[in-house]
């Protein structure tokens, strides 16, 4: 009888040891999050179109709204017309200096002719000096005219360059009137409706990349030695009522500082007051939702 009691006590101790062992299904818990983007207006104007609703899926570059472009279109036309005016005012240098160049050619010919006559004794020195003086006058006149025309042309070219910059600015402003989705994901919130007045910096809608979710979990100091960035882990999405689904996860971030354990989080060591946040990337198959609880097995 004594041997039987000893055997029963041994079995009971083994069962209790198994029940109190650290063989949990998870090592850390947390909630699923997604990268959220708030899209704001980059131009002022009335919303002529805003054809998305909360819950809609949009793709990167997809146009979702249009801000009134009337005034910018008119401004673009004005800038284009201004550039044409500047272009028409640019002088044709070759035509405007042609007359003076022709006079200079004749004056040099006269200078050469008088130089020959003086050499032969058929003309006096005064006539040659007058011819040389005329050449110098025309050379100065041509140089001054060329300088003036160059200055005028450069000024008009600069004004045309300014018009080109203005045209690019208007084109950029027009582009910003066409509001597009910056990422692929789901529309979470819509802050305005078609017909309302949008202002620069005023939020239009918020969306999230729900294809690439991450679980923000918390680990204890003791667990830091068994987790590292890039590590593959098992993630369990908790659907409630004991229903879970397993996903492959990858540790992408570990906080450099500790924090007090959030009240809604369970850790491997329930006595731990300080924990470290970690992010675990998970590919979403459509079942994981923002705010859903999840568990991690390291």
Which residue stretches match the model-derived regions?
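Sec-dependent signal peptide recognition
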Residues: 2-13
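C-terminal motif of bacterial Sec signal peptides marking the signal peptidase cleavage site
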Residues: 15-18
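Bacterial signal peptide processing site
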Residues: 20-22
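Extended amphipathic alpha-helical segments
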Residues: 24-27, 74-88, 93-95, 102, ...
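Long, amphipathic coiled-coil "stalk"/hairpin helices in large membrane-associated assemblies
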Residues: 25-89, 120-127, 189-193, 200, ...
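Surface-exposed patches in structured soluble domains
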Residues: 31-32, 48-53, 57-60, 169-173, ...
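Surface-exposed connector loops and short turns at secondary-structure junctions
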Residues: 219-248, 272-296
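Short, solvent-exposed secondary-structure boundary/capping segments
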Residues: 257-268
């Amino acid at each position: 009888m004594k041997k039987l009691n000893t055997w029963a006590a041994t079995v009971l101790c083994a069962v209790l040891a198994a029940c109190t062992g650290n063989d949990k299904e998870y090592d850390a818990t947390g909630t699923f999050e997604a990268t959220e983007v708030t899209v704001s207006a980059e131009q002022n104007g009335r919303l002529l179109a805003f054809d998305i609703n909360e819950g809609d899926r949009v793709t990167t570059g997809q146009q979702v709204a249009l801000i009134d472009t009337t005034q910018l279109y008119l401004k673009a036309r004005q800038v284009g017309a201004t550039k044409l005016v500047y272009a028409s005012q640019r002088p044709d240098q070759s035509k405007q200096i042609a007359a003076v160049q022709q006079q200079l050619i004749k004056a040099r010919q006269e200078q050469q002719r008088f130089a020959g006559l003086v050499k032969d004794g058929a003309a006096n020195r005064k006539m040659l000096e007058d011819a040389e003086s005329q050449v110098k006058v025309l050379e100065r006149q041509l140089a001054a005219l060329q300088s003036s025309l160059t200055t005028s042309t450069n000024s008009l070219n600069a004004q045309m360059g300014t018009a080109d910059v203005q045209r690019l600015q208007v084109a950029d402003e027009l582009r910003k009137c066409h509001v597009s989705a910056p990422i692929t994901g789901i529309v979470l919130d819509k802050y305005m409706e078609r017909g309302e007045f949008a202002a620069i910096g005023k939020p239009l809608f918020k969306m999230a990349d729900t294809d690439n979710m991450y679980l923000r979990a918390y680990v204890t100091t003791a667990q830091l030695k068994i987790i590292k960035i890039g590590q593959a882990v098992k993630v369990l999405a908790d659907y409630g009522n004991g229903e879970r689904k397993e996903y492959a996860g990858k540790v992408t971030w570990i906080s450099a500082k500790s924090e007090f354990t959030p009240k809604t989080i369970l850790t491997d060591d329930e006595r731990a007051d300080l924990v470290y946040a970690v992010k675990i990337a998970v590919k979403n198959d459509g079942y994981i939702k923002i705010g859903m609880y999840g568990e991690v097995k390291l």
